[in-house]
Swiss-Prot record:
Record has Transmembrane as a keyword: yes
Molecular function GO terms recorded: gap junction channel activity
Source organism (scientific name): Homo sapiens
Lineage, top ranks: Eukaryota, Metazoa, Chordata, Craniata, Vertebrata
Protein name, entry field: Gap junction beta-4 protein
Chain ranges on the Cytoplasmic side, renumbered to this chain: 14-20, 95-130, 206-266
Record's keyword annotation contains tRNA-binding: no
Length: 266
């Protein structure tokens, strides 16, 4: 994947995104992906090599490392970023499907044929639901991975020394983690950015649902008032004083030219 493809992909997503979604994309690809590629992999590059225990028992450092780091931070973050960005691809695919269907429709019925969609640039119908579900899925993925990190690493902590008593270690041994402070800082940074992304996704969900409710139940969809229902002109025919039907406009002309006896009308 090159940067030109990534730019085209982001422009396709931004075409149908709100301001909150554009902020989310910036946070993901600047504060999460770039930090992960540039810095995080370098920090965790020596995680097992420099995991040292004060014992010479063969296999003890390996089992202790697996006990305290069952899954590497870097691999969990990579899986998290992949799952978080997949829903945006689904939105792009749905948009491409709509545009291709519209193109085939005009090729079959002519350029003057009515469009299948009212406005391709608006989120309506199935595209609205795809977009909304993608937001919920992204928030759920980030929340799920935050819970996994919390369960695997208590309070996202990175201690300097851990005590290990797993077999085949002969007794409780102390194991030392390399660069614990630096790893803790990056862990807190990734957790904070994930929490910000969850907040942005949920805010956009409430915004979209609230906007749709306003469109459905808003003032413009209420029934018109009785004053607006009344016609602007008189009915075409009214009864004259003699009981014969007479044009309403002629009655108005008579009313303007001579006084009309109000007592003759019921």
């Amino acid at each position: 994947m090159n940067w030109a493809f990534l730019q085209g992909l982001l422009s396709g997503v931004n075409k149908y995104s709100t301001v909150l979604s554009r902020i989310w994309l910036s946070v993901v690809f600047i504060f999460r992906v770039l930090v992960y590629v540039v810095a995080a992999e370098e920090v965790w590059d020596d995680e097992q090599k420099d995991f040292v225990c004060n014992t010479k028992q063969p296999g003890c450092p390996n089992v202790c490392y697996d006990e305290f780091f069952p899954v590497s931070h870097v691999r969990l973050w990579a899986l998290q970023l992949i799952l978080v960005t997949c829903p945006s691809l689904l939105v792009v695919m749905h948009v491409a499907y709509r545009e291709e269907r519209e193109r085939k429709h005009h090729l079959k019925h002519g350029p003057n044929a009515p469009s299948l969609y009212d406005n391709l640039s608006k989120k309506r119908g199935g595209l609205w639901w795809t977009y909304l579900l993608s937001l919920i899925f992204k928030a759920a993925v980030d929340a799920g991975f935050l819970y996994i990190f919390h369960r695997l690493y208590k309070d996202y902590d990175m201690p300097r020394v851990v005590a290990c008593s797993v077999e085949p270690c002969p007794h409780t041994v102390d194991c030392y983690i390399s660069r614990p402070t630096e790893k803790k800082v990056f862990t807190y940074f990734m957790v904070t950015t994930a929490a910000i992304c969850i907040l942005l996704n949920l805010s956009e969900v409430f915004y979209l649902v609230g906007k749709r409710c306003m469109e459905i139940f808003g003032p413009r969809h209420r029934r018109p008032r009785c004053r607006e229902c009344l016609p602007d002109t008189c009915p075409p025919y009214v009864l004259s004083q003699g009981g014969h039907p007479e044009d309403g406009n002629s009655v108005l002309m008579k009313a303007g030219s001579a006084p009309v006896d109000a007592g003759g009308y019921p």
